Amino acid sequence: MRGLLGSSWKKFGHAGRGTYEWLTSEPGLPLLETQLQGTQGVSSTQEDVEPFLCILLPATILLFLAFLLLFLYRRCKSPPPQGQVFSIDLPEHPPAGEVTDLLPGLAWSSEDFPYSPLPPEATLPSQCLPPSYEEATRNPPGEEAQGCSPSV
């Protein structure tokens, strides 16, 4: 190995060149390899941008449009709110001496309130209060209490 390192290129010649100008002269044109690397540098940036423009950007746009359409679909198909809104038309100047009763004029009987937990014939004080302490202690544990129980 020392023999190879100690040997000089002068022993073997200048590899077929007629003069030694190539040692002292400045380089003229870049080598073919460096020219190819330069074009690869330009094409590599184009190769970096191409997957973004062809794959990632359209996929992102389609995903955004899908979420937008899903949001609009759910918004249009959402059920109406559960509360019932009604309006009362009151006269601006009621006749003098006449007492107007507003509640009988409302159409309570025509509408059932589906969100009410009470049965239609139940009133709050009569059926849905818990039994008194005396009634609860008098009844045996096996009997049904007379309080508010869901009707099936």
From Swiss-Prot:
Keywords: Membrane, Transmembrane, Transmembrane helix
Sequence segments annotated as region (Disordered): 117-152
Membrane spanning residue stretches: 52-72
This protein's record includes keyword Membrane: yes
Membrane-protein topology: Single-pass membrane protein
Subcellular localization(s) per the UniProt record: Membrane
Cellular component aspect of the GO annotation: membrane
Protein name: Small integral membrane protein 28
